[in-house]
Curated annotation (Swiss-Prot):
<keyword id="KW-0418">Kinase</keyword>
<dbReference type="GO" id="GO:0005524">
    <property type="term" value="F:ATP binding"/>
</dbReference>
<dbReference type="InterPro" id="IPR001267">
    <property type="entry name" value="Thymidine_kinase"/>
</dbReference>
<dbReference type="InterPro" id="IPR020633">
    <property type="entry name" value="Thymidine_kinase_CS"/>
</dbReference>
<feature type="binding site">
    <location>
        <position position="185"/>
    </location>
    <ligand>
        <name>Zn(2+)</name>
    </ligand>
</feature>
<feature type="binding site">
    <location>
        <begin position="87"/>
        <end position="90"/>
    </location>
    <ligand>
        <name>ATP</name>
    </ligand>
</feature>
<comment type="similarity">
    <text>Belongs to the thymidine kinase family.</text>
</comment>
<keyword id="KW-0237">DNA synthesis</keyword>
<dbReference type="GO" id="GO:0071897">
    <property type="term" value="P:DNA biosynthetic process"/>
</dbReference>
<dbReference type="InterPro" id="IPR027417">
    <property type="entry name" value="P-loop_NTPase"/>
</dbReference>
<dbReference type="GO" id="GO:0046104">
    <property type="term" value="P:thymidine metabolic process"/>
</dbReference>
<dbReference type="GO" id="GO:0008270">
    <property type="term" value="F:zinc ion binding"/>
</dbReference>
<feature type="binding site">
    <location>
        <position position="150"/>
    </location>
    <ligand>
        <name>Zn(2+)</name>
    </ligand>
</feature>
<dbReference type="GO" id="GO:0004797">
    <property type="term" value="F:thymidine kinase activity"/>
</dbReference>
<feature type="binding site">
    <location>
        <position position="147"/>
    </location>
    <ligand>
        <name>Zn(2+)</name>
    </ligand>
</feature>
<feature type="binding site">
    <location>
        <begin position="15"/>
        <end position="22"/>
    </location>
    <ligand>
        <name>ATP</name>
    </ligand>
</feature>
<dbReference type="GO" id="GO:0005829">
    <property type="term" value="C:cytosol"/>
</dbReference>
Length: 193
């Protein structure tokens, strides 16, 4: 973990659906709160699965958060924070380059930036903002789920439509839960066609 005297840094928590990304973000932010560091937690406006103004894991852990749409919104609310946490980075409305620039700007000013999000979309293609932040981050933690088909480590998010893999021409971002996505390993993942 970083100390305030260490200066800014970017930490990325990534993985497929149901790998515990938000749970890990919440765990880190609870430590920040215990350490009495000033912080802000942000969640994207597009994520409507849980109550507005909360970051929530699939297991039920929750923390208060600020719901925003863009990096400009984050920067407007993060002025005095020592730590900025951004959940579901891949769901923000903003241009991916703006998200990356904003995270860099905060870290360059001494802020510890913790982002969590999917590294790959349902087609197993990288989300652009996450791809760049993975390369720029001081710390990267890739988490794994358990494949629903075979029990191996899962690294892919299989989107389902009526119980079948979504086609390649389906929208890249569709917010959903267990009814729409399954965690799958490389072998059990069915590529979108």
């Amino acid at each position: 973990m970083t100390r305030p005297s260490d200066g800014g840094r970017i930490e990325v928590i990534c993985g497929c659906m149901y790998s515990g990304k938000t749970e890990e973000l919440i765990r880190r932010m609870r430590q920040v709160r215990i350490a009495r560091q000033s912080y802000r937690i942000f969640t994207p406006r597009m994520d409507t699965r849980y109550a507005e103004g909360q970051v929530a894991s699939h297991s039920g852990s929750r923390l208060e958060a600020i719901t925003v749409a863009t990096m400009k919104d984050i920067l407007a609310h993060a002025e005095d924070a020592q730590v900025v946490a951004i959940d579901e980075l891949h769901l923000f409305d903003d241009d991916p380059a703006e998200m990356v620039r904003g995270c860099q700007w905060l870290a360059n000013r001494g802020v510890r930036v913790i982002v969590a999000g999917l590294d790959l979309n349902y087609r197993a293609e990288p989300f652009p903002a996450m791809m760049h932040l993975l390369a720029l981050a001081e710390q990267v933690d890739k988490l794994y789920a358990i494949c629903v088909k075979c029990g191996a480590y899962a690294t892919r998010s299989q989107r389902l439509i009526d119980g079948k893999p979504a086609p390649a021409d389906a929208p890249t971002i569709v917010v959903g839960g267990l009814d729409m996505y399954e965690a799958r390993c490389r072998t059990c993942y069915e590529p979108a066609v």
